[in-house]
Amino acid sequence: MGFQFQNQPLWKRYRSEFPVTERLIYLNHAAVSPLPRRVARAMKDFADDACEFGSMHYDTWLAACEGVRLAGARLIGSHRDEIALVKNTSEGICAIAGGLDWKPGDRVVAFREEFPANYYPWKRLESRRVQVEWLSATDPLDRIEEACRGAKLLALSFVQYLSGLRECKGHR
């Protein structure tokens, strides 16, 4: 059975992880997406363990988190100490916006059409005299490159919130 699974096209293997596709054509992946079967199973296993044993297996849970950090580090070619696990993208963006050592005159480049969680944290920095250069997702690459010179941070989504457009700005 596993061999047959491996011979399926990649999209079919992924699709089989999402039971919602058996009932719906699901297109709303912008903020809250359906859980893959394996994620739902892992969450259930964790909840059952916590329910039945309390914190007795806390060391195992921490080891699992460290394994995820290590896998993430390998994936992007970094060290696991550079990987933080957060609940969601919004929490991560807020942690970065609130956690960096911002000084008056520091510059951020951001986009007006962003999802609110990637807009308001940078907008809020303006009150701390951080300069935010607001661009449009339709600006040409040269304009974006120019704006990024000397900037401390570029806040850019891979998939555009309003249009769903997946930009490959770095590819020419």
Name each model feature, range by range.
Residues 1-172:
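Pyridoxal 5′-phosphate
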